[in-house]
Amino acid sequence: MKHSKKIVTALLALAMSQTVMAAPVALDRVSVQINDGIILESEIGNMLATVRANANKSNQTLPSEQALRTQVIERLILTRLQLQMAERIGLQIGDLQLDQTIESIAKDQKLTVSQLQQQLENDGLSFSQYREQLREEITLGEIQRIQVQRRIQVSPQEISGLVKLMQEQGLKEVEFQIGHILIDVPSEPSSEQLEASSKRANIVLKRLNEGEDFRSTAIASSSGPKALEGGIWDYMNINEMPTLFAEVVNGAKVGDIIGPIKSGSGFHIIKVMDARGLQTKEVEEVKSRHILLKPSPILSEERAKAMLVNFQKQILSGEADFAELARQYSEDPGSAAKGGELGWSSPDVYVPEFAQTLNSLKENEMSEPFRTTHGWHLTQLMDKRKTDATEQFNSNRAHQLIFRRKFNEELQAWLDEMRSDAYIEVFEPEVNRG
């Protein structure tokens, strides 16, 4: 599960921060100012320690200390800008939602929350720090979804066009793991700046062709969004990857290095790291219903959850009917009139918490109240079925592929816009700002 993968990163980051805190340290100082916010030297040090630990674990060579520090500062700047945006729009991840996420993580690990906490403490980790790091991860995911999703439109013509293309390609599709290095150029660059960036890109390409490690080179040289991950993008189908990638990867072989490719953001170097065939299988669809309560100034988080707990008791005891409660109380206008019924669909069309809950239920089983970005839910899995890749499924899949591609492109555009509009000042290590 997605949260299961994140826990490893979170644990490692916490281990490093504990190590730093345990040793005597010099007085902390401001290293970066971002609008009205700051990044402390200790934050940079903690992330540097985490990156080094990850590199040691995977036997990965790292670039020079200065190059690594630059990448870490850039990552922290983008993170802080997103958190500032979340604060401006009033986005907060409450303790109840955080508790629910931790319960899901523990369940994925086949642990209770107490066992998870004990496991963290046995490793010398602070459970409170782990909670706050997780809160930040959820906040970043939510602010990206809120701000980027509204920039994306997927037209019926795009969907039908991709469905037709997928049918022409047949079922033997391929997913690619892409390596990406971006040598950026300033906004409105001069001809001299363009030439300098072009030369840098060609030097990087020459080193790669001579056998230099791609991941180390990306960490040292790239200004792309995945630089700290060695420039590696996870497996993507041609139809969901950013357009720039798709245009050059189609027909390429594993190991091919392509570039430099010029775009508005700079010069790109792309390497096909790996490729694999998509596994074709039957699709499981679920029929479900739910009751949604949305917290507000009038309805608190605690009250919304308590109401659903009471509904659950009434339904289980036979005092109330799920459909009638949904019609009377649910704040989902699309399903309330139908007794909360959502119809048949693949679980992955829903937000992750809802999909995860549906996947954990047996037929006719009702969930405990749980929180998503939409509010508090009580859901029941009514039925399951296996289906072939029907026309509707192909349309849904085409929509998802197009949406993911546009999301990746728009996310980077949004981050670039925020960064260019922000006041950012980086203070050199030797400058003491008291």
Swiss-Prot record:
Chief location: periplasm
InterPro entries per the UniProt record, alphabetical: OMP_Chaperone_SurA (IPR050280), PPIase_dom_sf (IPR046357), PPIase_PpiC (IPR000297), PPIase_PpiC_CS (IPR023058), PPIase_SurA (IPR023034), SurA_N (IPR015391), Trigger_fact/SurA_dom_sf (IPR027304)
A GO molecular function held by the record: unfolded protein binding
Domain of life: Bacteria
Keyword annotations from UniProtKB, A to Z: Chaperone, Isomerase, Periplasm, Repeat, Rotamase, Signal
Domain PpiC as annotated: residue spans: 173-274, 283-383
Endpoints of the signal sequence: 1-22
Localization in the cell: Periplasm
One GO CC term, this protein: outer membrane-bounded periplasmic space
GO aspect biological process, one term: protein folding
Entries under Pfam families matching the protein: Rotamase, SurA_N
EC number: 5.2.1.8
Catalytic reaction equation(s): [protein]-peptidylproline (omega=180) = [protein]-peptidylproline (omega=0)
Purpose: Chaperone involved in the correct folding and assembly of outer membrane proteins. Recognizes specific patterns of aromatic residues and the orientation of their side chains, which are found more frequently in integral outer membrane proteins. May act in both early periplasmic and late outer membrane-associated steps of protein maturation.
Domain comment, as recorded: The PPIase activity resides only in the second parvulin domain. The N-terminal region and the C-terminal tail are necessary and sufficient for the chaperone activity of SurA. The PPIase activity is dispensable for SurA to function as a chaperone. The N-terminal region and the C-terminal tail are also required for porin recognition.
The protein's name: Chaperone SurA
